[in-house]
Amino acid sequence: MHPFQWCNGCFCGLGLVSTNKSCSMPPISFQDLPLNIYMVIFGTGIFVFMLSLIFCCYFISKLRNQAQSERYGYKEVVLKGDAKKLQLYGQTCAVCLEDFKGKDELGVLPCQHAFHRKCLVKWLEVRCVCPMCNKPIASPSEATQNIGILLDELV
């Protein structure tokens, strides 16, 4: 490839020889673009697609978790901020018998007993009572009201 090819064969591109001939770039159409430009455009499109796919999966999983908590009537907390108000540090999950650790996702029932969220969902699929006190869990309409009351109490 000649170094002058991009400048229509004249020396203006390198500034080596002064010439009276006017030098201008030829118009470039989309079909004349080099292959690497197509690769950049294609790669950017794939990147944006993958990023949007990741966001969609994240929001779908969040919606699924929210639907489970509304279905079974428990409030979801992360053992970080809300756990201090509920005094959950050092306690044990009654379902799996493991201690609560930092950033664990917990489910808090209307009776104020807390469990790991996954443990609680499995328990509530089998029995609709609290694993600690055997208090029945309210129906979904009552559970929504109870969750609102619990949220107001925690804030």
Curated annotation (Swiss-Prot):
SUPFAM superfamilies associated with the record: RING/U-box
GO BP terms: negative regulation of mitochondrial membrane potential; positive regulation of apoptotic process; proteasome-mediated ubiquitin-dependent protein catabolic process; protein autoubiquitination
UniProt keyword annotation of Coiled coil present: no
Tissues expressing the protein: Widely expressed in several tissues and cell lines.
Membrane topology: Single-pass membrane protein
Transmembrane segments: 40-60
Zinc finger (RING-type): 93-134
Signal peptide boundaries: none
GO function term, MF aspect, one: zinc ion binding
The keyword tRNA-binding appears for this protein: no
Protein task: May induce necrosis and apoptosis. May play a role in cell viability.
Protein name: RING finger protein 122
